[in-house]
Amino acid sequence: LIDERISLQTMLVDAAGSKNPEYTEVLNLVDHIKYEGLTPGEEYEITGELYETKQLQEGTAEPVARGTVRFKAPASSGEAAVPFSVRTASLEGKEVTAYETISKSGEEVASHTDSHSKAQTIRVAPKPHLPGTADNAYAIPLLLALAGSVLIGCTHVFTAKIRRPL
């Protein structure tokens, strides 16, 4: 049962309110939902599911996180927030999209499921690469510095031998 009088608008952000979260091993997201058309005083449940966007569009998606919020609608229009926590190891550099459904007495009355919605989608930042001691980026400057030191040392020894009195 979908009630056509109910409309939803959503915005998925990180816990700080950003659409561009920094990398973290566990990403805390909040799906902000604006609703219109609910019956004031009635109990509702919003269920949010977070999916990898590409898999959603290919039809092979399983939720990577779920969140549920129960509330009594104070007015026909209002806002609710569904929190998610998701481990980012398999999602680095990928987009995730939130789908929402609103139920009343166990029956779905509204949903918002659009895998192309930028408001419902957020990109999981890749893990930053920290240079290690064995990185090749440091090898060439180190070799050049070593070669320069050897050259200066040899020049000093050679010059010192030439200046010696006989």
Question: Which residues does each PLM region occupy?
Answer:
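Short beta-strand elements
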Residues: 1-5, 108-127
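Short proline/glycine- and polar residue-rich coil/turn motifs
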Residues: 69-80
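Short, solvent-exposed loop/edge segments of extracellular or virion-exposed proteins
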Residues: 9-19, 131-135
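Contiguous beta-strand segments within globular domains
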Residues: 20-32
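Enriched for extracellular/lumenal, surface-exposed ectodomains of secreted and cell-surface proteins
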Residues: 49-56, 85-113
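Juxtamembrane/start-of-transmembrane alpha-helix segments at the extracytoplasmic/lumenal side
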Residues: 132-146
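Short, surface-exposed loop/turn segments at beta-strand-coil junctions that are enriched for proline
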Residues: 36-38, 74-76, 85-93
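C-terminal membrane-anchoring or membrane-association module
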Residues: 148-166
